[in-house]
Swiss-Prot record:
Recorded name of the encoding gene: pcp
Annotated active site: E80, C143, H168
Protein name in the entry: Pyrrolidone-carboxylate peptidase
PANTHER family given in the database record: PROTEASE FAMILY C15 PYROGLUTAMYL-PEPTIDASE I-RELATED, PYROGLUTAMYL-PEPTIDASE I
Chief location: cytoplasm
């Protein structure tokens, strides 16, 4: 049986919970097709988060690795297209670090694309009743940091054949209640969307070709 690694983050920026961890841990141990889900939490800390991801890849040897993170203010599940090789933190991480214009991997490329079937995932999430879209930026905080670190690891011989990517999710309703005017999504919808992302990835070797870009 194949393994699907899901990661979520600990809370950050004074939030008592992080929806990414709440959503992925709800799927821990679940069987989807011929795969079993293993969910693990990463620290919201530059460096340590990539180290944690690398250790999980070595330990679990997953067929698929999907990192999930909170993006307060987004209105739908965002299936990320690209990770960029820069840290530029608007706020400090949970260890107090705030790197600015810092390269993630000195010998790494400027960017990596997700190897998930991102457009098929969005199509199937929407068909399952979950608002979703392809996103062209994962930001420059710890989410992008982990996304880049994941894809950098999968670009090595040890990562050959492993598919990886990143999904951002909105606030939970109880978080949005503390941020008037911000969008939210129920935990049930988040879990359903991530489950669908896994099922679609397992079933899709070549992504669909359909519109998923933005003008700005």
């Amino acid at each position: 049986m194949r393994t699907v690694l899901l990661t979520g983050f600990e809370p950050f920026e004074n939030e008592p919970i992080n929806p990414s961890w709440e959503a992925v841990r709800a799927l821990d141990g679940e069987r989807i097709g011929d795969a079993v889900v293993v969910a693990r939490q990463l620290p919201c800390v530059f460096g340590a988060a990539i180290d944690g991801m690398a250790a999980l890849l070595r330990e679990l040897k997953p067929a698929i690795a999907i990192a999930v993170g909170q993006a307060g203010g987004r209105t739908e599940m965002s299936v990320e297209r690209v990770a960029i090789n820069v840290d530029d933190a608007r706020i400090a991480d949970n260890a107090g670090a705030q790197p600015i214009d810092t390269v993630i991997a000195a010998k790494g490329p400027a960017a990596y694309f997700s190897t998930l079937p991102i457009k098929a995932i969005v199509r199937d999430m929407r068909a399952a009743g979950v608002p979703a879209a392809v996103s062209q930026t994962a930001g420059t905080f710890v989410c992008n940091h982990v996304f880049y670190g994941l894809m950098h690891a999968l670009a090595t011989p040890a990562g050959e054949g492993v598919r990886g990517g990143f999904i951002h999710i909105p606030y939970l309703p109880e978080q949005a209640a503390r941020h008037p005017g911000e969008a939210s999504m129920s935990l049930e919808s988040m879990v359903r969307g991530i489950r669908q992302a896994i099922a679609t990835t397992l079933a899709t070797e070549v992504d669909v070709r359909e519109q998923g870009g933005q003008l700005h």
